[in-house]
Amino acid sequence: MSDIVWHQHSIDKQSRADQKGQNPILLWFTGLSGSGKSTLAGALERALFDAGFHTYLLDGDNVRHGLCKDLGFSADDRDENLRRVGEVAKLMVDAGLVVLSAFISPTREERERVRALFDQGQFIEVHVSTPIEVCEARDPKGLYSKARAGEIKNFTGISAPYETPTAAELTIDTSKGDLATQVSALLDYLAAIQVIDSEKLKKAV
């Protein structure tokens, strides 16, 4: 039997959420490199923040500067990377925040493992379904060129698979329509499921 026990605090997550006037959730943006995950998540966070919501964006590149800087890109390391991010996101949701995360997260198993950490309705999977042809044409970091040249091994979409979500709450192709329209669709969805108050939302659009 473990000597480590869970310490129950006097302030629970519902109290923290009530103080902030919002329903905390995790929006998990998944898709290929260059699909527009970070751009879309960042624009949504800006809209929510400007309307007075308490948010935080976890970005795949940023966490590797600190939390996950000891990890590489092997299958095991990528799995551990997402495990850590999922646990951090859970703490943030417990703190009452609307959390946005932008990670390739290529396998259904990885994504479902993170989903299992959260209460029903608190994990919203957003599949950024931009076609690989568009992602490769964008190639903002030059990664596709390196992968095609064999300089990057196990690159998702080229030499490693991406498992398309089968039950994502939302699917957005960033090659169709403009960013403002896509953000508005996300805001409308969050209002419809009563994650955010529609009156506060009016300030964000």
Curated annotation (Swiss-Prot):
Protein name as it appears in the record: Adenylyl-sulfate kinase
Q: Its function?
A: Catalyzes the synthesis of activated sulfate.
Residues that coordinate or bind ATP? 31-38
Q: Which GO terms describe its molecular function?
A: adenylylsulfate kinase activity; ATP binding
Question: What top-tier enzyme class does this entry carry?
Answer: transferase
* Domain of life of the organism encoding this protein: Bacteria
Keyword Chloroplast among UniProt keywords: no
HAMAP family reported for this sequence: Adenylyl_sulf_kinase
The positions making up the signal sequence are: none
EC number(s) in its UniProt entry? 2.7.1.25
Pfam families reported for this sequence: APS_kinase (PF01583)
Cytoplasm as a keyword of this entry, yes or no, is: no
Q: Which organism is it from?
A: Shewanella pealeana (strain ATCC 700345 / ANG-SQ1)
Q: PANTHER family in the record, alphabetically? A: ADENYLYL-SULFATE KINASE 1, CHLOROPLASTIC, BIFUNCTIONAL 3'-PHOSPHOADENOSINE 5'-PHOSPHOSULFATE SYNTHASE
Mind listing the UniProt keywords for this protein, alphabetically?
Answer: ATP-binding, Kinase, Nucleotide-binding, Phosphoprotein, Transferase
Pathway recorded for this protein:
Sulfur metabolism; hydrogen sulfide biosynthesis; sulfite from sulfate: step 2/3
Q: Which reaction does it catalyse?
A: adenosine 5'-phosphosulfate + ATP = 3'-phosphoadenylyl sulfate + ADP + H(+)
Could you provide one GO biological process annotation from this protein's UniProt record? hydrogen sulfide biosynthetic process
Q: What InterPro entries is this protein classified in?
A: APS_kinase (IPR002891), P-loop_NTPase (IPR027417)
